[in-house]
């Protein structure tokens, strides 16, 4: 789906005003830094010297396993499959899942997996897309209620603060805190209730089929493509879709 398009299966006309917006986080508002930079950071904290070539090789190997930001599906092994299934519902499972994934990196040095997980959760690892802050501020200035709805297993609020967008959301709903993860209907309904709108009056903005499950509740949904950190992802289209709230 292009950023200019939305799907509306609510049974209502698409002219029905959108009065609140739900945003996914990773892949929608921000992306992790280039993987080679994270690998170099991990090497530094582990006291390992890597040349540019080896850093690139390790980054490519980890990306091929489906590390965050790679755009590749995760290659989940039986040794951490249970943790992977629960990664968005438990901090412990989230850590176990991603450390397990990184542990399979060919040529990794001692301490690599733990260091990569530490870097993943660090606020400075995350880079907002070029249109994230302008879009959120424009919606906020127009009085549009906003909620962050994220499948995640660690507290992303310090990341939001680092990106200077923490004060732009009325509610921050994290799957591991509420006990529901997208595509479960409950997490979308929870967001709508908190924002004080009916599902048919809301827009979900995300980058995955889990986000698109909001359509089943009558929430119009905008999906954006995989985009490199710092580039324009296309969420600025939201400002053209949302009606000004009634006075």
Where are the predicted features?
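N-terminal helical cap/lid subdomain that shapes the substrate entry/recognition surface
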Residues: 15-130, 142
């Amino acid at each position: 789906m292009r950023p200019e398009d939305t799907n509306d299966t609510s049974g209502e006309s698409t002219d029905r005003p959108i009065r609140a917006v739900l945003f996914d986080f990773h892949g929608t508002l921000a992306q992790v830094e280039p993987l080679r930079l994270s690998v170099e950071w991990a090497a530094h904290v582990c006291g390992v010297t890597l040349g540019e070539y080896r850093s690139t090789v390790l980054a490519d190997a980890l990306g091929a396993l489906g590390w965050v930001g790679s755009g590749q599906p995760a290659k989940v092994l039986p040794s951490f499959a249970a943790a992977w299934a629960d990664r968005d519902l438990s901090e412990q499972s989230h850590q176990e899942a991603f450390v397990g994934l990184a542990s399979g990196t060919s040529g990794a040095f001692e301490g690599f997996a733990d260091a990569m997980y530490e870097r993943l959760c660090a606020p400075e690892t995350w880079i907002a897309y070029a249109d994230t802050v302008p879009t959120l501020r424009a919606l906020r200035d127009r009085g549009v209620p906003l909620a962050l709805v994220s499948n995640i297993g660690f507290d992303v609020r310090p990341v939001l603060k680092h990106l200077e967008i923490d004060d732009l959301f009325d509610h921050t709903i994290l799957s591991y805190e509420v006990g529901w993860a997208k595509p479960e209907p409950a997490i979308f309904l929870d967001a709508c209730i908190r924002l004080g709108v009916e599902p048919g009056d809301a827009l979900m903005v995300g980058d995955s089929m889990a986000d698109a499950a909001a359509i089943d509740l009558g929430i119009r949904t905008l999906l954006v493509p995989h985009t490199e950190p710092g580039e324009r992802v296309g969420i600025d289209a939201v400002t053209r879709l949302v009606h000004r709230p009634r006075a």
